[in-house]
Amino acid sequence: MCDMGGLDNLIANTAYLQARKNSEGDVKELQKRRKSLSLPSTDVSRKEIKETITLDYQSICVEQPIGQRLFRDFLGTVSEYKLAEEFLEEVKEWELEEGSAKEQLMEKLVSRRFKEPAEGSLNFLGKDLSSRIQQAQSKDMPELILLAKDAGNAFLMDAPFQDFQNSPFYDRFLQWKAFERQPINQKYFYEFRILGKGGFGEVCAIQVKNTGQMYACKKLDKKRLKKKNGEKMALLEKEILEKVHSPFIVSLAYAYETKTHLCLVMSLMNGGDLKFHIYNIGEKGIEIKRVIFYSAQICCGILHLHSLKILYRDMKPENVLLDDNGNCRLSDLGLAVKVKEGKPITQRAGTNGYMAPEILTDVDYSYPVDWFAMGCSIYEMIAGHTPFRDPKEKTSKEEVKRKTIEDEVVFQHPVFTEEAKDICRLFLAKKPQNRLGSRTNDDDPRKHAFFKSINFQRLEAGMVDPPFVPDPSVVYAKDISDIADFSEVKGIEFDDKDSKFFKRFATGAIPISWQKEIIDTGLFDELNDPSREATGGGGNSGEKSGVCSIL
């Protein structure tokens, strides 16, 4: 007898993998669709957009990818501005270099820009700083280069930024902002197989029709949300994801609604979660060099959340996902909460086996709980089980709670290095004030000897190769037949209050993520080509691509 469930899964996986590869037929379909696209006219974009934009240098010229790109293009038209921009790029290259190569780069930079500036003087330095640099010894030069960097950034924020606002490059930025704010609905995407499910709905793979970019779409059932009073939690997750822009945390790209669902479109992580890699590939556990690499990236992600006054509360390997290249990101911020002065957090939240003693004993808690869960996760990646569960027998929830509160961690697995034992002990300290990351205001876990092989500047710049790369021909997700369907929610009706909530949630494209997608997929260069002409017709029709026709 034909296994229809297996056939359905095969078809869904084939379509999904084909979309990820961008076959020749898909490329032709994409090119055809892009020909119909064009930017809004300059007059329209100026009128509708200019008044809504806050003229903030950091936001426009640094954080927003298209703003940054157009600002750099503008700087290239004025020799003095171009010189400053090139100098800052050279400083950035020097900061990210290692060993003797870094020393050589510094000597080259000093000679080229300070000692014998054949390409022109850096006038923004001022007489005092220029004099100090000219008289400085080599040992003092790194500090002076950083002062020169600060002076260069301050210079670009002044006259160059003002001139940029009166240039055609800024007009083009406004056109892109108008394009960015186009309405987003389900016709903007192709939908593929289900990847999993959560408390309020399912997660599926989707593809943007105009760019070919793949994402994961978290679909929250409107009726289920209302029935379970989950609206506030869903909106909080969305608002937190909007604020977060880190290579170590999943990014939110779009928020839109359908008739039945609220949809969060986020980074698609094809490599599976760390729980899968701990328990389903070879012997339980992960080799130590991978543990160090993932832990370093996780630390960066947690520190980014804390810098935004956000408490994660659900750190565990299951919520750490790998991308195509083997880099990891934190996911599922459904339990995350904003930390507010004078408002203690006491609600029990998290996953059994990862919750800190202060959560389990119902006292006030804050950022240290994330570091406790980090210690549990490092231990689990190495040992193949969490620190307060007996791997040889079933441990009750109450026993895990007792051990977490009372027992010291024991290291029986032979793979634990001394550095690994030490960082786990420090993260798993019972008292939050004794916990690594929380002992002082500047207690940075990245400085621990466990991470001695990691250059964090290069890691954050994406310049460190992951020790493991997922197989691109594998779908790291359950078979679609193993993902249970949701039952229909009955007896729920929507009113004006619900409609207002849906509108507040469905805000469309998220600027930084959307702009990155536009640049990475080549659409920015295509639509900026002065010789290009759009053929008209709009770009979001409901036609299915060849990839999707077998679904």
UniProtKB/Swiss-Prot annotation:
It catalyses: L-threonyl-[rhodopsin] + ATP = O-phospho-L-threonyl-[rhodopsin] + ADP + H(+); L-seryl-[rhodopsin] + ATP = O-phospho-L-seryl-[rhodopsin] + ADP + H(+). Residues 529-551 are annotated as: Disordered. Its main location: membrane. CDD domains: STKc_GRK7. Belongs to the protein kinase superfamily. AGC Ser/Thr protein kinase family. GPRK subfamily. GO terms for biological process: regulation of signal transduction; signal transduction; visual perception. It comes from the Eukaryota. The active site is at D314. The keyword Kinase applies. Residues 542-551 have a biased composition (Low complexity). Residues 57-174 form the RGS domain. It is an enzyme of class 2 (transferase). It is a lipid-anchor. This is Rhodopsin kinase grk7-a. Residues 189-451 form the Protein kinase domain. Although the protein is present in a diversity of vertebrates ranging from bony fish to mammals, the mouse and rat orthologous proteins do not exist. ATP binds at L195, G196, K197, G198, G199, F200, G201, E202, V203, K218.
